[in-house]
Amino acid sequence: MDALFVFIIILATAVICLFLFQAYTIYDNYHNIIEFNEKYGGLEYSRSPGGLYIDKRVFDPNDSETDPKAKWRCVNYNNNQYASASKFGYLATSSRNPVLFTNLEDCVYYNYTRGEIGTIWNPCAEYGEGSAECSTLKSHL
């Protein structure tokens, strides 16, 4: 055996030992790794200097919108009722009937758990730009 062959054998043995040591360390601390991932999983897709990442685990109808007026929001429709609104109009059950909620939490829950935007009622398209309903919609945006 020459010296080069012995050096390669020693180097290969050291690499294999380091790999096995790392594998054992991961095996030994696996429960700590799982606990860390559960605790800090919400920060996985946060804004960072590396770019903007979108968390697709939660539905957000505003993810694909870049215009602030096009983003869906909950607005005070009447004195004590809330509705989902954007520049496209109000979320509605049918024409001229926006979906109304008694509190803000129910409105937010409806916006972010449905998974899709259904019927939209736009008073500006139906009654014209000068109507009171259209002015109310625009005042919320």
Swiss-Prot record:
InterPro entries hit by this protein: Poxvirus_A28 (IPR007664)
Virion surface side: 22-141
Maturation and modification: Contains two intramolecular disulfide bonds. They are created by the viral disulfide bond formation pathway, a poxvirus-specific pathway that operates on the cytoplasmic side of the MV membranes.
Cell inner membrane is among the record's keywords: no
GO biological process annotation, one example: symbiont entry into host cell
UniProt keyword list: Disulfide bond, Fusion of virus membrane with host membrane, Late protein, Membrane, Signal-anchor, Transmembrane, Transmembrane helix, Viral envelope protein, Viral penetration into host cytoplasm, Virion, Virus entry into host cell
GO cellular component: membrane; viral envelope; virion membrane
Transmembrane regions: 1-21
Alphabetical list of Pfam families matching this protein: Pox_A28
Protein topology in the membrane: Single-pass type II membrane protein
Domain of life: Viruses
Record keyword Membrane present: yes
Primary location: virion
Compartment annotation: Virion membrane
Reported function: Envelope protein required for virus entry into host cell and for cell-cell fusion (syncytium formation).
Family, similarity comment: Belongs to the poxviridae A28 protein family.
The protein, known as: Envelope protein A28 homolog
Species for this entry: Fowlpox virus (strain NVSL)
